[in-house]
C-alpha cells in the first residue's frame, strides 16, 4: 500500500470526522497529522486490507479520545462561557445568521450528550458510515451501535425539548430560542 495514495483517499473524510468531533480547526489539524503519522508507521501491520477504512478511523477516534481526556476540564469551562454569551447576545435578524445559529444551537446541544453518543451520531449522520463500519471503528457490536444511536437521538430530542423553543418566523425561517430557566429563590 502506498502511503500517499492512502493519504489522498482518506484525508478529506478523516478531516471531516475529526473536525466534527473536536470543533476546533487547529486541534483537528494536529489530530489529522497524528492520525496519518500512525497510519504511515503501522500500515504494514494491517492484515486485512478490507478493514483499512475502519482501521484508519479507529486510529483517528482513539486520538480524539486521548485529546478529550486531556482537555475535558477546559472544554467544560469553554462551554459554560459559550452558553452565557449566547444568552446575552440578543435578537438576531439576518436569515443566514439565524440558520447558522440554529445549527450551532443544535451542535451545542449535541455536545451535552455523553461522548459515546456524540461519536455515533457524527459517524452515522454526518459521516454516513454504516452500522457495520461504526462497529469496526469503535470496536463494539452492530447491535450496540444501533442501541447507542437510538439512545443518542432520544436523549438529544429530550435535551432540545427541555432547553429550546422552536418557532417559524414570518419569513418561514425555523429558529431556536433557548429556554431561560427560572432561578429558584435560595431559602
List where the protein language model places each region:
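A short, charge-rich alpha-helical start-of-domain segment used by transcription regulators
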Residues: 1-16, 32
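Helix-turn-helix DNA-binding module
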Residues: 111, 115, 119, 127-144
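DNA-recognition helix of helix-turn-helix
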Residues: 138-162
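Sigma70-family region 2
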Residues: 36-51, 71
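Arg/Lys-rich amphipathic alpha helix in sigma70-family domain 2
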Residues: 47, 58-79, 99
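Structural recognition of an alpha-helix C-terminal capping motif at a helix-to-coil junction
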Residues: 30-37, 50-62
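Short, basic/polar amphipathic helix motif occurring as a linker/hinge flanking DNA-binding modules
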Residues: 67-89, 165-169
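C-terminal edge and immediately downstream basic/flexible tail or linker adjoining helix-turn-helix-like DNA-binding
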Residues: 2, 154-187
Amino acid at each position: 500500500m502506498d502511503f500517499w495514495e492512502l493519504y489522498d483517499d482518506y484525508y478529506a473524510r478523516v478531516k471531516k470526522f475529526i473536525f466534527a468531533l473536536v470543533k476546533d480547526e487547529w486541534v483537528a489539524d494536529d489530530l489529522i497529522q497524528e492520525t496519518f503519522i500512525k497510519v504511515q508507521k503501522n500500515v504494514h501491520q494491517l492484515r486485512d486490507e478490507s478493514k483499512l477504512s475502519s482501521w484508519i478511523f479507529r486510529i483517528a477516534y482513539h486520538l480524539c479520545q486521548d485529546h478529550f481526556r486531556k482537555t475535558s476540564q477546559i472544554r467544560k469551562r469553554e462551554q459554560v462561557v459559550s452558553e452565557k454569551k449566547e444568552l446575552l447576545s440578543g435578537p438576531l435578524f439576518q436569515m443566514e445568521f439565524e440558520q447558522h445559529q440554529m445549527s450551532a444551537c443544535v451542535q451545542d446541544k449535541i455536545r451535552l450528550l455523553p461522548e459515546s453518543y456524540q461519536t455515533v451520531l457524527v459517524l452515522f449522520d454526518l459521516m454516513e458510515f454504516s452500522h457495520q463500519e461504526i462497529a469496526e471503528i469503535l470496536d463494539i457490536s452492530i447491535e450496540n451501535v444501533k442501541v447507542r444511536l437510538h439512545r443518542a437521538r432520544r436523549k438529544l430530542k429530550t435535551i432540545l425539548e427541555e432547553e429550546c423553543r422552536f418557532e417559524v418566523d414570518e419569513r418561514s425561517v425555523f429558529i431556536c430560542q433557548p429556554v431561560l430557566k427560572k432561578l429558584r429563590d435560595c431559602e
